[in-house]
Amino acid sequence: MMNIDDTTSPMAHPIGPSQPPSDQTKQDPPSLPQEAASSVSADKKDLALLEEKPKQSQEEDRVDTGRERLKKHRREIAGRVWIPEIWGQEELLKDWIDCSTFDTCLVPAGISSARTALVEEARRAASASGGLHNRCLILR
């Protein structure tokens, strides 16, 4: 009795009456006519294609990470996007970048004057004592 085991391959496996059907890893070479042999080779090609599909899906899964998708997108889009030199709203950008009006409000003037006062006080104390040793500490 001949049976085709769909789980392993489309090739024919002999199954005896005392032998239950099972997954057989050993395959007998086909003794089929020329037409059947060509269909078997076509089936082998189909199996090879099916084996390649999981490999391709694994590559697609690897590409699905955010960083890989961004790299792929940059490669695909490079050269197709036109970036204009002038877009007509540069004045608004310059106004937004200029933060001098905020800087005066955020940095109090008293900080710089307090630092200056401390430096002057240290210089007066050093000159009053007349020691060269104290001057070296101030200049550091």
UniProtKB/Swiss-Prot annotation:
It comes from the Eukaryota. Residues 1-10 have a biased composition (Polar residues). Disruption phenotype: No visible phenotype. Bic1 and bic2 double mutants have a blue light-hypersensitive short-hypocotyl phenotype and an increased anthocyanin accumulation when grown in continuous blue light. InterPro entries: BIC. Residues 42-68 have a biased composition (Basic and acidic residues). GO terms for cellular component: nucleus. Transmembrane segments: none annotated. GO terms for biological process: blue light signaling pathway. Regulates the blue-light dependent dimerization of CRY2 and formation of photobodies. Interacts with photoexited CRY2 to inhibit its activity. Inhibits CRY phosphorylation. Interacts with CRY2 in both darkness and light. This is Protein BIC1. The gene is BIC1.
